[in-house]
């Protein structure tokens, strides 16, 4: 099962588009986040896992691979928590109808509430320049 969502990152003072891909497959249960994540992004997996369960959803008991593309640009900060959670829910069939022309940014608390993130203005400008019709922060 596969899902892809839009997000944005920050490189210096400029925003850039990031595709958050989630693939759920057979095999030993594990979570792998690839695409040059920093330590805060790698920790997103733990926050997403806890938030998903505390919101009443089921964590898929399978192998989950998350790719943050483009893979050659470093991804920093907790801004990818929300799109990771939505990608896992969509790929596992627990969420439908995520708007294809929308992008998502946000840090999650362990209970699933959203926390503020830094650098939203340059990411919002990049979203507008890239044809994103809605930005959920």
Features from the language model and the residues they span:
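Peripheral, non-AAA+ core regions of ATP-driven protein-machinery
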Residues: 1-137
């Amino acid at each position: 099962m596969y899902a892809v969502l839009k997000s944005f990152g920050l490189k210096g003072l400029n925003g850039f588009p990031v595709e958050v891909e989630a693939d759920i497959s057979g095999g030993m249960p594990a979570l792998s986040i690839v695409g040059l994540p920093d330590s805060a992004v790698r920790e997103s997996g733990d926050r997403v896992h806890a938030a998903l369960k505390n919101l009443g959803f089921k964590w898929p008991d399978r192998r989950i691979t998350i790719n943050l593309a483009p893979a050659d640009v470093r991804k920093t900060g907790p801004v990818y928590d929300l799109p990771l959670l939505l990608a896992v829910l969509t790929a596992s069939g627990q969420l439908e109808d995520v708007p294809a022309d929308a992008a998502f940014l946000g840090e999650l608390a362990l209970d699933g509430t959203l926390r503020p993130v830094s650098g939203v203005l340059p990411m919002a400008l990049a979203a507008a320049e890239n044809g994103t019709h809605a930005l959920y922060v």
